């Protein structure tokens, strides 16, 4: 007789964990140990559920690499005892966290599903129940006793995405996330339809490796008409700065002004890693397609291809934390490690 999957619910904070005090109207933190009382539907799921919470749940605006390590360590310590993990997280930075965890959890052979909500769990119109119930169902999916999904995902409003391909696109709608450059992994309707051919392949029998060193000496710089030499020079000169995500126009284009190219050339020669990521919501960087990007290619700017900004900055933190040799850094960044780029 096949045993039920064991699922660990990890509550970090966020709107999903709030409940409205109907007397005062104030949102207050919800005790997740009493989860079954508030969502009795969970009793009908074909899995065993346990919960764990941050000692001090946080608003996702306060998430940082130290908190990512905390999530990773919870998964690491519980990995042998559970078949899947659901991380409850505020939606504002969920794509950053899902991207970071995808790089930190090497050889992952179990599902880690991030989810949250736009309305609190106690609100009459909440999207929290559907997101939570379906995320748990997805984490429980098995074939012949093995997990169907073995990567870090994000589930929101009927759709499951690869975590490091997502970005938040709306502050108010329930359909708050998108995966512009990679199809959805699954969709929930009358049936739960999984696109198995799109899921990352199982990592054979390799042991889970949890990478906990992330280097935060990085920055995101967005190109805009009027960016000036004084400001960019000041940014490049920040002490201990090791990498920049440069959000460029279109397919990787930027101003061809001599001062701009010279600043970047000097920075790259000094060891600074500069990654070219499009500021468009979809599409890919293709340096050399236009004159306005050919100079960037010549001076050694790294192509982010079709990576999201969220995945780019967390991948940069991860690779810097691994002390990747400068000679191979560009090659490794331009290589897909966890399905984050084409």
Model-identified regions with their sequence ranges:
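Short glycine/serine/threonine-rich phosphate/pyrophosphate-binding segments
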Residues: 18-19, 93-98, 131-132, 253-255
């Amino acid at each position: 007789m096949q045993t039920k999957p064991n699922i660990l619910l990890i509550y970090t904070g966020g709107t999903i964990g709030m409940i409205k005090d109907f007397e005062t109207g104030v949102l207050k933190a919800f005790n997740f140990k009493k989860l079954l009382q508030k969502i009795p539907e969970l009793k009908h799921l074909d899995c065993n559920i346990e919960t764990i919470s941050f000692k001090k749940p946080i608003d996702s605006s306060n998430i940082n690499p130290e908190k990512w390590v905390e999530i990773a360590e919870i998964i690491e310590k519980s990995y042998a005892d559970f078949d899947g993990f659901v991380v409850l997280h505020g939606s504002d930075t969920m794509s950053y966290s899902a991207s970071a965890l995808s790089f930190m959890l090497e050889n992952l052979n179990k599902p880690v599903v991030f989810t949250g909500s736009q309305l609190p769990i106690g609100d009459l119109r909440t999207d929290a129940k559907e997101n939570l119930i379906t995320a748990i169902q997805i984490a429980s999916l098995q074939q012949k006793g093995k997990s169907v999904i073995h990567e870090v995902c994000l589930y929101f409003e009927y759709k499951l995405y690869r975590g490091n391909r997502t970005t938040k696109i709306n502050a108010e709608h329930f359909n708050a996330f998108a995966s512009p450059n990679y199809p959805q992994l699954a969709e929930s309707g009358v049936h739960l339809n999984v696109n198995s051919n799109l899921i990352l392949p199982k990592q054979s029998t390799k042991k889970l490796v949890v990478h906990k060193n992330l280097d935060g000496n990085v920055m995101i710089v967005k190109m805009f008409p009027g960016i000036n030499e004084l400001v960019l020079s000041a940014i490049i000169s920040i002490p201990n700065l090791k990498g920049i995500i440069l959000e460029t126009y279109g397919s990787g284009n930027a101003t061809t002004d001599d001062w701009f190219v010279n600043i970047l050339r000097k920075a790259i020669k000094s060891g600074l890693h500069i990654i070219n990521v499009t500021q468009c919501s979809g599409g890919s960087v293709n340096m050399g397609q236009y004159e306005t990007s050919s100079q960037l290619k010549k001076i050694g700017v790294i192509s982010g291809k079709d990576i999201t900004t969220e995945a780019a900055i967390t991948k940069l933190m991860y690779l810097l934390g691994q002390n990747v040799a400068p000679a191979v850094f560009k090659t490794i960044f331009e290589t897909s490690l966890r399905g984050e780029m084409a």
